[in-house]
Amino acid sequence: TKPLITATTPHEIDTQARSAMAEHQPLYTLDEQLLGDLAPDIIVTQDLCHVCSIDLAAVQRIAATLPTKPRVIALNPQTFEAVLDDLLTLGQAIGREHQALATITNLRNRVYSAQEFVNPFAAGESVAMLEWTDPIFIGGHWTPQLIERAGALHPLNPTQPVKGAGAAQGPIGMTQRQAGKSIAIPPEVLVASQPDAILIAPCGRSLAQARNDVLELSKSPWWPTLKAVRTGRVALADGNHFFNRPGPRLVDALEFLVGWLHNRPALIPPGLLWEKWP
């Protein structure tokens, strides 16, 4: 696939994407010739975010024209648990169910190990996770889950217990909580919330791009009024590397959050693309 968005700044990208979607224009193109040459048996795509990847209907249409008539598997995980379930779905699809189960077990063990450093019943710091900077979008889906399981709060888009889950507290109960989609907020709402810590991991942006995005954001008159800015509790991350994509690296994200929020740097996996700001 190849993006059709040509803008480079967050505001311009958002404007161009909104305009294209309003006119029912695609945001991505698929190399049909290359796909045909590859002759896949299975095509894995996603139906979670129409801005992040090619439209599912387009993939299905093209797949139907291929001689191999590949099976299209569309993933749509809304929660961290659903991300792990999708690993099993893919493992079963390619005849590697045993390996998928082993991978899931390993990932869950890492989650439990990280959470041993967290008191799930104590009120932690409030965190604002920005997955876009202009306009400001607050992270949703699995991101609030990870933040809360790392012992913090995500008040601008918190999780809620699923129906019938009661309070859904504690290490096990928290698996019965989920959040909605990412939400756009005006800067005034961010300022009013005065988060203790701010994590900025723009969707689809590299760490260098995130650095430039935050540099522009920091020129806003309200930026220095934020408590997290004044106390040096702002971190940048390559969102694609370990936050925005629904895959195994979400466990890296949880380990990072526990290490960063609780001042335990040894818990942060080596090689993660993140840095403190400024």
Please give the residue ranges for each predicted region.
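N-terminal ligand-binding lobe of clamshell/alpha-beta domains
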Residues: T1-P278
